[in-house]
Structures are given as structure tokens and as C-alpha cells.
Amino acid sequence: MTQLITTIEEMRSIIANLHNQRRSVGFIPTMGALHDGHLKMMSLSLNENDVTIISIFVNPLQFGPNEDLDSYPRDIVGDTAKAESVGVDYIFHPTVKEMYPELPTIELKAGRLASVLEGAERPGHFDGVVTVVNKLFNIVRPHKAYFGKKDAQQLAIVEKMVEDFNHPIEIKGVDIVREDDGLAKSSRNIYLTKNERIEAVHLYKSLCLAQSLYKNGERNSEKIIKATRDYLTEHTSGTIETVAIYSYPELVEQTQIKDSIFISLAVKFSKARLIDNIIIEG
């Protein structure tokens, strides 16, 4: 049976016992509103570790002043049932006051990797991410931690943070889980209207177009980006905020593609801002 833990003290006590028993710990940090993408990460952890822990914490530090912190979906009962259905051992579900008794005096800065793409669109977002992830790593002390490739920039930043701060943690990037029509699973998909949901499938289709151009020999980023943007303009009513090609995981913008890249896009619908990407190995 999955145990719900709400305090740092209790979580640390459990972790100390697990480490004393030399049991391996897998960890999936989440903000709740669990979907099949989260469940895939949990299943991988269950296969690779003795104990699997997830956190459910809507971190206020990573939301901007006009973002959806207050309306972000929260359903701890439903989330617990989903986690229990796959066999998760512990859910760490602290309150904001438990995690931040007062505003943090010291916050981490994600640096150059956060100055592009989502970081440029959402200033301070990745600073909040690395601050809370670093804090969670210090509490849970996992051997492996799992992050979805849908947030590829976040994955690259967390990997760099672990390297820079010498966390003894293996970071595992998990492939995007998609709906049958290709839309990436996301907690924010529930915000889409019926028509927007129909249009949203074209985010993935536009990425497939970009990938096809690459596979057919196109290496000029500007041409791939234009074709992708033109496709999105024709097939969606959303505002196209980003279509970009960067090296991965270095996150350096590419004009002429040479090595591994990721093609990233963001489209803003009426109440949902969706992101998606494809990573292409060089």
C-alpha cells in the first residue's frame, strides 16, 4: 500500500532506514495531476529500484505572476489512487509552508541554460525548478531520478545541476508518452477546448515534418523552422510562441545543424500553453 508522507522529518527518517538497509531508491518529482507519462516513469523506477518514491508538490517558485499557480489542477486523492495502482511505495506531499516556512533566503540560478527557449519566455521559471529539485534531492536522496523528455530543457538543466553540485544521483530521461493521435500527455491538456484539442495534434505533426526534412538531408535551421512554423500557422489557431532548434544537451542555438539537436516549440491556446519537442541524435 502506498504511504502518504507530508513532513520532511518523516521522509528523512524513512530514507535513513532505507539507506541503512542498502535499498535502492528511485524518485519521480511531480506537481501532481498525474497522467500516463508520470505512470511510465513510475513503472521504470519500480523495475530498476527496490523502492519508488514520488513527490507531489506544486512549487510556487517556478510560476510567474501571470501564470496558472492558483488554477493548476490538484487532486491528491486521484493521484494517490494512480500511484497506488502501479505500486509506488511512498508519496511525499508536503505543504508550501512545510517546504518554505518563509521565503527562501537563498535561491539557485539556472544560468545560461535557462536564458533561452522556455527560460526566455518564463523568466525565473528554471531558477524555481532547480531550487525545489535541489531541495527534494537533499530530502529524498535517491539513487536514480526520472524526468520526462517532454520538458527537454528542464532535463538538460537538472542534469547539469546534478553534475555541478556533485549529487550522487543518476538522472534518467524518459521518452514522451503521447495520446493515440500524437499529442504529448500533459497536465495542462485539460484546459483545451474541444476545437483546440483537435488542433493540438498538429504540434506533433509539425515536429514530424521537421524531422522528415532533417532525415532528407536539410541542415539549415532557418528552413526547417520556417516550414514548421508555416505548418502550425495553417493548422492551428493558437499563438506560435516558439519554434527553435538547439544543440542538445548544450542548448546552443543552431544555424547549421551539425550534432545532436532538439527541435522545440510552444503554442499558446486560449487557456493552455503547450510545449513539445523531438530530440534528434547526431
Curated annotation (Swiss-Prot):
Its EC number is 6.3.2.1. Pathway: Cofactor biosynthesis; (R)-pantothenate biosynthesis; (R)-pantothenate from (R)-pantoate and beta-alanine: step 1/1. Pfam families: Pantoate_ligase (PF02569). (R)-pantoate binds at residues 62, 154. InterPro entries: Pantoate_ligase, Pantoate_ligase_C, Rossmann-like_a/b/a_fold. It is found in: Cytoplasm. Beta-alanine binds at residue 62. Disulfide bonds: none annotated. CDD domains: PanC. One of its GO terms (molecular function) is ATP binding. It comes from the Bacteria. SUPFAM superfamilies: Nucleotidylyl transferase. Transmembrane segments: none annotated. GO terms for biological process: pantothenate biosynthetic process. It catalyses: (R)-pantoate + beta-alanine + ATP = (R)-pantothenate + AMP + diphosphate + H(+). The active site is at 38 (proton donor). ATP binds at residues 31-38, 148-151, 177, 185-188. GO terms for cellular component: cytosol. Keywords: ATP-binding, Cytoplasm, Ligase, Nucleotide-binding, Pantothenate biosynthesis. Catalyzes the condensation of pantoate with beta-alanine in an ATP-dependent reaction via a pantoyl-adenylate intermediate. The reaction proceeds by a bi uni uni bi ping pong mechanism. Belongs to the pantothenate synthetase family. Homodimer. This is Pantothenate synthetase. It comes from Staphylococcus saprophyticus subsp. saprophyticus (strain ATCC 15305 / DSM 20229 / NCIMB 8711 / NCTC 7292 / S-41).
